[in-house]
Amino acid sequence: MKTLADAFHHTLKDIYYAENALTKAMPKMISAADGDVKSAFEDHLKETREHVKILKKVFATIDKPAEGEKCDAIEGLIKETEGIIQEASGKALGACLIGAAQAVEHYEIARYGTLRQWAKELKNDEAHDLLSQILDMEKAANAKLTGIAVAAA
């Protein structure tokens, strides 16, 4: 990567891969969870599918095809979550699933915050607005998970 535009495109492909990977991983989390945690995961799966649609629009703003590039970070977080599902049970399972989901949210918040700022620097107002929408949704999802964790404590 030699330019900010290159970095933007690379990171956009990274988060696109991550969101698509999450749409495949989240059903396992939903199956393992119950109560408010399950409901929050179901809601977030719907939002994640919406994020993929919005990201396609961001790709269009830079005249690039919507395609992912393997994201080792999200693969690691998904693998960790799969281990939690196999090893944890009872109240610990719910708490660990919330922690795993928040690790994903924090990764996404960092990526979307970076992309949004880069879109601003690249004077791509449409991408900035679209990425702001997703960033706001990710922050809200994280806050919802925090609320569930606090209520369960």
Task: Please state what every model-predicted region is.
Residues M1-A153:
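Amphipathic alpha-helical hairpins
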